[in-house]
Amino acid sequence: MSPQTETKASVGFKAGVKDYKLTYYTPDYETKDTDILAAFRVTPQPGVPPEEAGAAVAAESSTGTWTTVWTDGLTSLDRYKGRCYGLEPVAGEENQYIAYVAYPLDLFEEGSVTNMFTSIVGNVFGFKALRALRLEDLRIPPAYSKTFQGPPHGIQVERDKLNKYGRPLLGCTIKPKLGLSAKNYGRAVYECLRGGLDFTKDDENVNSQPFMRWRDRFLFCAEALYKAVAETGEIKGHYLNATAGTCEEMIKRAVFARELGVPIVMHDYLTGGFTANTSLAHYCRDNGLLLHIHXXXXXXXXXXKNHGMHFRVLAKALRMSGGDHVHAGTVVGKLEGERDITLGFVDLLRDDFIEKDRSRGIYFTQDWVSLPGVLPVASGGIHVWHMPALTEIFGDDSVLQFGGGTLGHPWGNAPGAVANRVAVEACVQARNEGRDLAREGNXIIREAS
């Protein structure tokens, strides 16, 4: 019997509310290699001690409930409880702490991102002892990450499939995102790919609306794709959005895409759901499709500074659930991103091993062992003059996506695509020759044009 069950049996069962910190705050706990570790930014209500707030998070996201229940005596809580093992005040913030919580591996179902999130962030966010709570980072132990398939193909396999090396890949979201007929939509796809882009993309809201049903769009885009491939001699792709109202319909669209022979499909991973995403990722690996992930609705969870969860947590979850590309902010352009922090989670997506580095927002050393990498996608308000900065920041293993930055070209879509391709090749060449992109960027672009 564990010490806990013993005391309970001998003293008799006492109901009533008790402080979480008596059971769940364990500052001398040594974390195990198999524990899932979480860093929460906790803002306790006035009068609630930080230890109690941290312990409350550990309790409510693992075995605890608001009172002592007699069924606690039927299990070994010491084996299954989450533990708040560290607290540190956040510099420059009043009454804000980083609480470190360790969860035993047995609390989680293998291969289920859905269950991991339900457990860790399922019901702690409405907790009344806390004014605000934000999940900043997770450490996923290899013992858990090995139960996931991960990205369908990963960076290296994708480059081999596309036969494109040594430069960032170029994409473009087809605009206007809603209202074009399938035929005109296909025409825009053809012009962009013909001009020199590697990919074009369905906007995340394009599913199957009255003005353009999914099957028509898939057909016309495939036609555009093959025409552009035949004329340029390069392998190209269009992210066909398979997101749908049911998982069955989503898989049906992915199957149709595979039958057309296209290389890549797309999914909105937050609105579609983790479960649907993992199913689609498995289908994609089994059938040789690349999978582009759009994180629509990310800002709902990730935008507030002290509540919700940081994007790097969603990025880690996505690498486990599966996706070959994921949108990751830009550092420049219209969507926000601080440079070091963005680079932090870009590395989490691409690299096998990432050292703890608080200046980049990385709270734990993360070892992905052999899980394939994900290509970060920079998109949102970027255009050709951002190219030197983007090449420097994101490096070769990335997809740079210009929507309005291609289609907004005064001469039309194809010249816009040409401009982007010329710019990226000029930047890569200049970088390889040892020139300073940050300083000479504009000059490099001018020379190229």
Swiss-Prot record:
Co-factor binding comment: Binds 1 Mg(2+) ion per subunit.
One term under GO cellular component: chloroplast
E.C. numbers: 4.1.1.39
Residues at the site labelled Transition state stabilizer: 334
UniProt PTM: The disulfide bond which can form in the large chain dimeric partners within the hexadecamer appears to be associated with oxidative stress and protein turnover.
Domain of life: Eukaryota
Record's catalysed reaction(s): 2 (2R)-3-phosphoglycerate + 2 H(+) = D-ribulose 1,5-bisphosphate + CO2 + H2O; D-ribulose 1,5-bisphosphate + O2 = 2-phosphoglycolate + (2R)-3-phosphoglycerate + 2 H(+)
Pro-piece positions: 1-2
Entry binding sites for substrate: 123, 173, 177, 295, 327, 379
Cofactor or coenzyme needed: Mg(2+)
Classification via Pfam families: RuBisCO_large, RuBisCO_large_N
Principal localisation: plastid
Single Gene Ontology BP annotation: reductive pentose-phosphate cycle
Residue(s) carrying N6,N6,N6-trimethyllysine: 14
UniProt modified residues of type N6-carboxylysine: 201
Active site: 175, 294
N-acetylproline modifications at: 3
Record carries keyword Lipid metabolism: no
InterPro entries: RuBisCO, RuBisCo_large_chain_AS, RuBisCO_lsu_C, RuBisCO_lsu_C_sf, RuBisCO_lsu_fd_N, RuBisCO_lsu_N_sf, RuBisCO_lsuI
Family statement: Belongs to the RuBisCO large chain family. Type I subfamily.
Further details from the record: The basic functional RuBisCO is composed of a large chain homodimer in a 'head-to-tail' conformation. In form I RuBisCO this homodimer is arranged in a barrel-like tetramer with the small subunits forming a tetrameric 'cap' on each end of the 'barrel'.
Name this protein carries in UniProt: Ribulose bisphosphate carboxylase large chain
Organism: Salacia pallescens
Gene that this polypeptide is encoded by: rbcL
